[in-house]
């Protein structure tokens, strides 16, 4: 990998996944990316002063392998999307391949998370009502930074007392709010026109 990338003048490696961060940092990072730093995308966005001005209020699921290393993840999330954030505790039940390899255990974990989500819904709706942010029966969003957790959280869509629970990445929610609903096709178009260098490793 180091030989493949050595022609690029890389200063910073930005990652969005906690497991990827840990693997890169723990496996000869300095040999592969000499003189580079590694940073989580959420902390990178804060560094660049990119944040939502008027977040509608969110639930936040902190993954077991959080990529946010510089400060408490909740502090980072609130700085990015606003103070109206309620942390949703407990594992989502996905845990990498746990949902596939041990559905018996995963299902029990899922039941506990479902109970937690109902409490979190009540707490977030109270925060939203106090700040006039959303209708009492509006759908809620739960944000995370982990691909496995996003998959697990997507299974809870119908489990709230009122409204639906929509799971998404923090950075995707920010892109949608800052750049508009069509941010993804526009990004792909720019990338395909030469905006991103593709390296096969």
Identify the role of each PLM range.
Residues 1-201:
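Iron-sulfur cluster-binding electron-transfer modules in prokaryotic oxidoreductases
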